[in-house]
Amino acid sequence: SFLTQLELEKIPMIDKAGLAILGNDNFLLESLNKKKGQSYIDDYVAWTISSSKCLGLKVINAGGSEVFKQGVQSFELDDIVPTYGVSSRQILKALNKANENLKIEHPLHVHCNNLGMPGNVKTALDTIDASEGRRMHLAHVQFYGYDDKGKRGFSSGSSELSEKINKNSNITVDIGQVLFKPTVTISSDILRQFNAKKHAKPNKWIISEVEDGGGGIVPYFYKENNFVNALQWVIGLELFLMIKNPYQVFLTTDHPNGAPFTSYPELLRLLMDLDFRNSQISKINKSAV
């Protein structure tokens, strides 16, 4: 974390900050397993934030990196982490309570389980319910806006997800819009990156498993004639346009996972210019519209 702060200091002009990542580390999981209590976890979170000098707290696929070591490929909110006997939901709720108890200004920043998987909109909806009214920020929700209907088993769940967000003022989100171009996906969600490596373009990738987490770097090319990519593009725009409160939704491409941040002008035009948006819709895979 010290080296990270030194590197951030070298970046000029823009505001920058870090989020400390917990949710797959032995200390937390063991504390939950041994029922150490919420105040014990609060102290651990406080020490982590203070030591790392971070702005807030993030959880990435709570328990997912740990179950990856057991050969698991998907992990639901109520699935149990082997060895520790705690569920992803328990991890999430404990960290969210700590974030609230410590009055950390940034809400718990959540990378939900089952990113990129058909039907994962249910996971996102369950995660919102797990907040129990506490503040929570869901990251790159476009990647959780997927239902599993239709003959291809992949469809838009944006209507259901946006409706849920509209009804829960404690929730904020950023979109993680996909745009059609080559990019590189970088994530600490090792389950997702391991599953995605077969789609690497070019076919070079890195997967790293470490004691308290993991992740990977996988290059990818989003193409407008690809059904899945086109539907991802549509779902992101639908979420932008159907979430009613602009203070609940943040404009992002989840740089660089959906697209590089240099694509923001294109994204802004897509949202603000109906004629341009319609012209771009006419170019994508027709099955996705």
List each model region and its residues:
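A short acidic, amphipathic alpha-helical/loop segment
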Residues: 3-5, 30-31, 122-127, 266
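Active-site mouth loops of central-metabolism enzymes
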Residues: 17-42, 83
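Internal, charge-rich low-complexity segments
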Residues: 27-32, 182-197, 266-288
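Histidine/acidic residue-rich metal-binding segments in metalloenzymes
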Residues: 36-61, 65-249
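Metal-associated gating/positioning segment near the N- to mid-region
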Residues: 1-11
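Active-site microenvironment of metallo-dependent hydrolases
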Residues: 1, 112, 242-249, 255-289
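Conserved residues at the C-terminal ends of beta-strands
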Residues: 1, 22, 60
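Divalent metal-coordination and catalytic microenvironments
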Residues: 16, 22, 57, 111, ...
